[in-house]
Amino acid sequence: MGKILFFGLLLICIFLGFFFYKQKENNIIYNRIVEKFEDNVVIDEIYTHLFKDSNLKELVFIKSQLIIPELEHKKMIKATGYRADAYKALSTVYRFDFKVHDNKILGFKSVIFEGFEDAKVSKHENNLPSEKWQQLKDFNIGDPNINEKFFHLEFPFVVKNTLCVTISKGFFKKIKKLKRLKIMLISNEDREYKIDIENFLPKYNL
């Protein structure tokens, strides 16, 4: 009985050791959220890479799919108009969220993907009508000055800033081919936040 217990505990320890090794090796936290409203479905696949020794705390990649059965119909796929155009533009959206902690509210005036320094950048707000989404270039960083009136303030607590970067389907295909993700964020104060990690995107069915 004692030997059985010993070997059982040994196997558990080996399994846990392997599990935590894989978690550390991949360094990616995966989450899938499915939301239904009426007959429609929104599926978010979320991949989070955590950083330890920096004000830049998280890089989050999100693939969002909007499924509207009525518009999935073959006849509607070829349709035009506000609703059909919006659905075509927003049915699948790719996005990076960069989470930066500071004692100030930050704006980010530039995002640079190494290897694509000449990428075309949009700077409009993210929640927009379909005609603006049709104008999405390689990626969109939003309005860097939207919170400008708060930039001078300093707070006695941690401010969790999130920069949302929506990328086009074409640009996503390009960065998916990279071996490493090398990205630089430049804040309104000209502070640089650099990322250099293994490109985890090709490992998943995205």
Swiss-Prot record:
Alphabetical list of InterPro entries matching this protein: BptA
GO cellular component annotations of the record: cell outer membrane
Compartment annotation: Cell outer membrane
Keywords for this protein: Cell outer membrane, Membrane, Signal, Virulence
Signal peptide: 1-19
Function, in words: Virulence-associated protein essential for survival of the bacterium within the tick host and therefore within the natural life cycle of the spirochete.
Similarity section: Belongs to the BptA family.
Record-given protein name: Protein BptA
Organism listed in the record: Borreliella japonica
Taxonomic path: Bacteria, Pseudomonadati, Spirochaetota, Spirochaetia, Spirochaetales
Gene that specifies this protein: bptA
